[in-house]
């Protein structure tokens, strides 16, 4: 039986989810994306400030599904037809530069006995937040500008590459079986093959049938997509890979299958479900879980968090001169803020680091703290620079 104790945390979280876009729309001097407001409200209501709500097992599971749905939507949102070519090549080069810089910094920190793994730390500094960048650009109707193309491409590589490499780290630090390697290679090869075919072939005719079914109470497309998400999420987790990779793969596959006008309505339904319910639960729960008191009382954390925040900005901002022919210096500065915004993948990577024993808990907490600050500060700066440009 569900008790009041079980239901109360979810009730408070849903109340905060309703308040977040309202508060976001009221802030005029400081432009805060509603995702940032969700995290702030979670911190405020959490056990370390007002103590109105704490993370229960049921809320933890809903948050985990919200994280999976976020990566599912991220994969679904990636438009390979649009990115295929110079945009993706340039963004991949930029990410490679970020990785080399991040690992180099990680090696220095390892010599200073701050981190255990230079690779995982460096990888953590190369992440981006496509799930935050795209909604901001969409809300501003700024998806077609050269800046938007660069920002989406940079964020895409900052999501995909770290997750793929992190899956290899999970395998190497576990007890790998041949099936683990086969599964990872199959996922990558399958996505590459599907991308190649989708850019050259018309999507299957059954999409029209699915579009008709979405008008009925059966909602067959939503059920099929949910089955795909659950299946890949389960399979990747069962074989020792990061389960988020499965959610991302499910979104990419569905996006490729519905990448036409018939898929617009299906996409709208997913956005309603994701951003209306599950994704806000993830971000609010992230805020609730954020140990503000512990960080405030830790001298090490107070030193590490701002340093890690600057490292995020440096590693992702350093490659922006690659875009000097397309973007002016102010747009490149804005691109650095956009690319350095990191949280969902960062949380996944720190979880991997803790579970495999190659990242210290306090370092993981400081990285997540830097990630939380990045989504509080960098999108607001990005909006300010873009608004200034529009004016």
Where are the regions that the model predicts?
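Hydrophobic alpha-helical transmembrane segments in multi-pass integral membrane proteins
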Residues: 7, 50, 102-108, 159-173, ...
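Entry/N-cap segments of selected transmembrane alpha helices
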Residues: 8-22, 79-118, 122-123, 176-192, ...
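Structural signal for the N-terminal portions of transmembrane helices
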Residues: 9-14, 56, 60-66, 91, ...
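C-terminal ends of transmembrane helices
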Residues: 16-30, 71-85, 131-144, 195-210, ...
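Alpha-helical transmembrane segments of multi-pass membrane proteins
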Residues: 17-21, 43, 47, 73-75, ...
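Membrane-interface junctions of multi-pass transporters
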Residues: 26-32, 43-90, 205-220, 224-306
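Juxtamembrane helix-boundary/capping and inter-helix hinge elements in multi-pass membrane proteins
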Residues: 32, 76-88, 110-115, 136-149, ...
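Short helical (or helix-break) motifs at transmembrane helix termini and adjacent helical loops
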Residues: 99-105, 125-165, 312-322, 341-352, ...
């Amino acid at each position: 039986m569900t008790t009041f104790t079980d239901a109360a945390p979810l009730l408070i979280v849903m109340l905060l989810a309703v308040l977040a876009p309202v508060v976001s729309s009221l802030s005029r001097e400081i432009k805060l994306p509603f995702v940032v407001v969700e995290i702030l409200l979670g911190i405020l209501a959490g056990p370390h400030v007002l103590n109105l709500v704490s993370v229960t097992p049921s809320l933890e599971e809903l948050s985990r599904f919200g994280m999976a749905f976020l990566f599912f939507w991220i994969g679904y949102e990636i438009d390979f037809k649009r990115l295929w070519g110079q945009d993706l090549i340039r963004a991949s080069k930029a990410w490679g530069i970020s990785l080399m810089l991040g690992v180099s910094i990680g090696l220095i920190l390892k010599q200073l006995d701050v981190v255990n793994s230079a690779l995982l730390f460096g990888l953590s500094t190369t992440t981006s937040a496509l799930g935050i960048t795209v909604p901001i650009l969409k809300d501003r109707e700024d998806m077609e500008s050269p800046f938007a193309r660069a920002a989406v491409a940079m964020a895409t590589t900052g999501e995909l590459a770290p997750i793929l490499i992190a899956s290899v780290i999970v395998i190497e630090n576990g007890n790998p079986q041949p099936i683990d390697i086969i599964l990872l290679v199959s996922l990558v090869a399958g996505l590459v093959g599907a991308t190649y075919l989708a850019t050259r072939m018309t999507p299957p005719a059954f999409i029209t049938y699915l579009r008709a079914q979405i008008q009925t109470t059966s909602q067959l497309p939503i059920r099929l997509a949910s089955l795909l998400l659950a299946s890949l999420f389960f399979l990747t987790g069962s074989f020792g890979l990061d389960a988020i990779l499965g959610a991302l793969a499910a979104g990419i596959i569905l996006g490729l299958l519905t990448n036409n006008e018939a898929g617009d309505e299906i996409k709208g339904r997913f956005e309603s479900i994701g951003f209306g319910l599950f994704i806000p639960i993830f971000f609010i729960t992230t805020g609730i879980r954020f140990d503000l008191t512990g960080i405030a009382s830790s001298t090490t954390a107070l030193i590490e968090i701002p340093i890690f925040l600057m490292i995020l900005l440096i590693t992702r901002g350093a490659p922006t001169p690659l875009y000097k022919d397309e973007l002016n210096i102010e747009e490149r500065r804005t691109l650095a803020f956009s690319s350095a915004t990191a949280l969902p993948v960062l949380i996944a990577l720190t979880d991997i680091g803790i579970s495999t024993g190659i990242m210290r808990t306090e370092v993981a907490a400081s990285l997540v703290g830097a990630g939380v600050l990045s989504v509080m500060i960098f999108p607001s700066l990005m909006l300010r620079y873009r608004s200034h440009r529009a004016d």
